[in-house]
Amino acid sequence: MCEKKYAEMISIVQKSDEEWQRLSDEMTPEKMKLIQIIMGLSGEVGEIVDNIKNHIMYGKELDLNNIIEEFGDLYWYLRAGLKSLGINYEDMKENNIKKLTKRYPGGYSREKAIQRRDKEV
């Protein structure tokens, strides 16, 4: 992807999610496979992990600009993945809130996380 497209995408993301989605649609080839999206997500997470690892393990300065860039990339892949699966972004957020409310009624705590029972068979 060329710098012009990245700059345009950044500008549009700042305006609205609808406009951002339009640009994302243009940039995502119709035949893009879900595995490419998942690999992209994984790669971007790896870059964030590496940045934080270098900070914690080797005392390097935390590169917040890089982390912001990588989270932007994660957001792009997330939206592309949801679109490819026909999942609405707002529905995904709502379902996540329901899951967490069920898992941690009354709010999260370390103790509740250890004793959680929502995954028992």
Can you describe what each PLM-predicted range is?
Residues 1-121:
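Flexible "arm" and connector segments at domain edges
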